Regions:
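N-terminal acidic, glycine/proline-rich low-complexity segments
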Residues: 1-331
Length: 331
């Protein structure tokens, strides 16, 4: 395992924090890695427009003792909620974090964080949709950075980890397989295609199949307590003690070069999408893309991720102002 205790990896996280609870789990894992000095979280971009997602990120940051972390959101903002509404529910646990008066555009947060980072140092983790990242590429120079977006990314981002797509046998139409779509790719096909085709540098992908059997979060009520916002999010989304596949959590773990010996990488190649967002993979020696493959058991990988997901905050800030029963009653 790579030792980052003296050189934590600077990471920027792009998340939807809305439709599926693995986004909340991924932020929890990122904070646990930060507590170990494996990573240093520079900021968070919300790539959906519902302001409850923004406030939920702030609740989680505060719960883990980092209320100062900048959080941006896709503009214009809305009152939209996800189908299970966990973001609004955990926001109401901490009303001071739920006020929508501090919601800068995500592109501004991303640009400022990159501008302040050392050249070639940042790992960008995308666990949602691609609108903010495409907007970042298109962004002009401004007061935070003299470089336009594409040049800023090229100068500052050393590595990009993306949860998205479906790989392996299903992504090889030349071998007779029928390609399939995946949620993050299908959300906006045009933006997905632009991101895949225009993003500077290499991209490491965590495909749907990589983590579909890696179930985590079942023990959160025991490891963090019933009133943890992470445990509540999982209970509201999937049911208490049920757990959820670890798509986004696995991407965050790989951003810190964790899971050594449990994950292997494909040959290099190029990822694209067709007009209905089905994943198209072309192996190529000079390609900038590759995808992760689990080479140990799903249970072993889940145990390692659960160890991080279930860790209580090292230095929590403030108190939670509602119990799990009250939050469930609101939902």
């Amino acid at each position: 395992m790579t030792d980052h205790r003296h050189h934590p990896v600077p990471i920027l996280i792009e998340t939807d924090l809305c439709d599926d609870v693995d986004d909340a789990g991924a932020l929890a894992v990122a904070h646990a890695l930060a507590d170990e000095d494996r990573v240093r979280i520079l900021g968070i971009g919300i790539n959906t427009s519902g302001h409850w997602s923004h406030s939920a990120a702030r609740v989680l940051n505060g719960y883990y003792g980092r209320p100062e972390l900048p959080v941006g959101i896709l503009h214009p903002t809305t009152d939209a909620i996800g189908p299970e509404d966990y973001a609004r529910a955990i926001s109401r646990m901490h009303p001071s974090a739920a006020t929508p008066d501090r919601m800068p555009p995500a592109v501004d947060v991303l640009r400022a964080a990159l501008a302040d980072a050392d050249d070639g140092s940042v790992t960008l983790v995308s666990i949602g949709y691609f609108g903010n990242l495409v907007a970042l590429l298109d962004s002009p120079a401004d007061a935070s950075a003299p470089l336009a977006g594409r040049e800023l990314v090229r100068a500052k981002v050393a590595r990009t980890v993306v949860m998205g797509g479906v790989f392996g046998r299903r992504a090889r139409p030349e071998r007779g397989a029928e390609p399939v779509s995946e949620t993050n790719f299908v959300h906006d096909v045009g933006q997905t295609a632009r991101f895949l085709g225009e993003w500077p540098g290499s991209i490491d992908f965590v495909g749907w199949e990589t983590a579909a059997d890696v179930i985590t979060g079942r023990t959160l009520p025991l490891t963090q307590g019933d009133d943890s916002p992470v445990a509540i999010a999982y209970a509201l989304h999937s049911g208490k003690g049920t757990g959820r596949p670890s798509w986004d959590l696995l991407a965050v773990m790989l951003s810190a070069s964790e899971l050594e010996g449990h994950i292997a990488w494909s040959e290099p190649g190029t990822v694209a999408v067709d007009d209905i967002a089905r994943t198209l993979w072309t192996a190529s020696a000079d390609g900038d893309h590759r995808y992760a493959k689990v080479v140990s058991s799903a249970e072993q990988v889940a145990d390692i991720i659960d160890d991080h997901l279930g860790r209580p905050p090292r230095q929590p800030v403030g108190s939670i102002s509602a119990s799990v029963s009250e939050v469930e009653a609101w939902s």
